[in-house]
Amino acid sequence: MCIRDRTHGAKFLRFSFYNYIWRVRVWDETDTPSEWSREAKFRLVPQGFSSAEWIGAITRKDARLPEGRKFHGGELKKPEVKAAWEDVDTLAKKSICLRKTFRTDKKIAEATAYICGLGFYEFTLNGKKVGDSEFAPLWSDYDKSVYYNMYDVTELLQEGENVAGVLLGNGFYNVQGGRYRKLQISFGAPTLLFSLLVNYEDGTRDVVCSDDSWKYDLSPLTFNCIYGGEDYDARREQKGWNRAGFNDARWRPVVVQEAPKGTLRPQMAAPVKIMERYGVRKVTKLTPEQIASACKSTKRTIDLSAFVLDMGQNLAGFPEITVRGKRGQKVTLVVAEALTEEGACNQRQTGRQHYYEYTLKGEGDETWRPRFSYYGYRYIQVEGAVLKGEKNPRKLPVLKDIQSCFVYNSAKKVSAFECSNPIFNAAHRLIEKAVRSNMQSVFTDCPHREKLGWLEQVHLNGPGLLYNYDLTAFAPQIMQNMADAQHRNGAMPSTAPEYVVFEGPGMDAFAESPEWGGALVVFPYMYYETYGDDSLIKKYYQNMRRYVDYLSTRADNHILSFGLGDWYDYGDFRAGFSRNTPVPLVATAHYYMIVEYLIRAARIVGNADDVRYYNSLANDIVVAFNERFQDYDAAQYGTGSQCSNALPLFLDMVLSRGHSGGYETDRHLERKVFKNLIKDVEAHGNRLTTGDVGNRYLIQTLANYGADELIYKMFNHEETPGYGFQLKFGATTLTEQWDPRQGSSWNHFMMGQIDEWFFNSLVGISPDVKHGYQKFRIAPKPVGDLKYVQSSYETLYGKITVDWTRENGRFKLKLSVPVNTVAVVTLPGEKEPREVESGKHEFVVNEQQTINEP
């Protein structure tokens, strides 16, 4: 069978609002065709929203919203800054409901809604929620890109009167503060752009747009902040407000607002949804003495009714409650991933105060959950209510049900991994839950304290992410965010979207760091390796080039000396800025790597001049690197730390002066540097000393040189640093520090680089020169006391399955190769690979284990 990849521009497709239907069939080796596939359809996005206008309750001018991206940290405490934010019109902070009545008096063939509600929206037609997404649209830098969503609403329209209803919240579009906030920024007051296209069976068409004919009123959401939580007063609900027949005479006409500055783009990435739910695992009633003590440690007043629920899983999301009580009674939900010594919810490390408050309307069972805010938590502290069946002398509301809603991007999981080592299996689950918690509109660092898109994770964890999730739609949006964040001079900030500009003493390193900004250049190539799709490289090549040229302006004799270095490296000191490895070494090595990736990109786009120019630059950088950081006699780089030696080994930067006086590759020196790296790991008790940046290079360098047995020893234990200690501690997501007791977030995935090793070494799967897995390598490494590995990986060509076992010195591999692909298989102890085509294969060999020499 032969299936060819083709990218079709489809220039003959010119009309928006029309469906284009397609289906496929294939022919086998005997030229016998298959049945036709089911029909699929797509449509071209409309060129704009026709006559739709941005509408809301108040204009930016009338709202008196401060401008700028420097409102964070100590800046927020300045009197003039506080005064500016306090002067904002309260209407600009509020959630509003908008409604529009319209008629459809003919038979409807199809109806499609296009909507952008900022910061977040909930859209209903005739009282029914449209779609199942949360926090729509995905957030962005609204000065650069604004995303909208499209829905088929044919089945939701009715003959006669219809009502479109939209609930708006602040999101990242309008971070006003009020409780905890990492930052404050406002692109404008909540706003809506809407267009509903109705095609009738008789060939005619109606369009319902957002304009000054819409009406609005304040919603029952009395407070909503992406950082601080959400309050809801059910007494303010207006029954039927989003249905036909409602009397909106008291509602106010909307105002036409200034449009956001960003380009309107269709949201192509999968939406964020409620993907999992967790019930109560354990209930703990707090005593009056515990509450009194906890009030001091948490810096808030805690009601004497308080009890704490352990939901069993740390996650990103919010609670959903069903409660019964009297009108006006309030239930407060405080969420946290940790507890104080007294057993109360502890937000000290994750940003306080964040909570949810629900005011009852007193009409039987009431079910509610937040709409526009989320947090990272495991525990829920309930105040002002009692559990069903408990004594209730104060006649408090009765909590009949409560669940934790795990909210994350709905991109598909494409792999599975299991082995005979319980620590590795559990570590894989820890990483998965942490990634999912931080896989929101962007890849965030944590789901509570910051919620910012720190970029080092995108490429340092990139291979692991691409092994585990379908990023075909998510990655392009990540790249657009990075392109939007890039400065005019080519600089790349450390976060995208860049909601805050880090300035001031000690903050410059956070503003930009090549280990973070390099994702702009590295990640598109990782995407290309995985999917065989070079579109991101071609689309963002100029951005990549501008960043390299910018770094060149920051270099002194080809040495970069700024950034965070090996952030959070490990040792007998407080984690944070790089301590074991010089920042210039890490920055310059990444500078070289970024240039090398740009050279690959230049070859793909066919720019021979750039290939020559940047090859010369790369040579200058690697020479300067060796002159500055190499200690030839000691066979080490920099301080001789693990990161210092792993980086040049991983990047093939180990050179020495030849007889001609110039620098050339020195394999003898390379072997000595590698041996020193091994010695350092062993000297630390087979433990790492690298950090957020160096972890990947250490693990992959050891793997590349055949030291997988050492990697196994490094992580097959229950001590720090290692995943086993976190598991023993009771963590259910990967923590920011190897020792969770040291504080910081308990829901970070930045230390999850081991997942790459699980797949490319233990499973042994990686793309070959034919990118996109049309041709791929299978080279499993049976290390330690592993008895088996079972794994699968869904490529664009189909599912690869790897199942190996070892027993009595015999290694047995079962392999399934997708149609139209080739696997290059290297079995343990064998040097010569073999190629096998699609189908199921079995191999049995005697075990041999070696450490490769470079």
Language model regions located:
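C-terminal capping/lid segments that line or modulate ligand- or cofactor-binding pockets
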Residues: A164, Y232-D233, E450, N468, ...
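Alpha-helix capping and helix-loop boundary segments enriched in small/acidic/polar residues
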Residues: E86-K93, T112, V130, L138-Y142, ...
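Non-catalytic C-terminal accessory modules of carbohydrate-active enzymes
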Residues: Q184, T191-S195, V208-W241, M268, ...
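Helix-terminus loop motifs that line ligand-binding clefts
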Residues: K128-P137, D141-D143, E341-Q353, T472-F577, ...
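Extracellular/oxidizing-compartment recognition motifs
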Residues: R4-N19, R23-R449, E456-Q457, A473, ...
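Alpha-helical support elements that line or immediately flank enzyme active sites
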Residues: A111-I115, L125, F318-E337, I380-A385, ...
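Active-site acid/base region of carbohydrate-active enzymes
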Residues: F120, T191-L193, D211-L218, L387-L430, ...
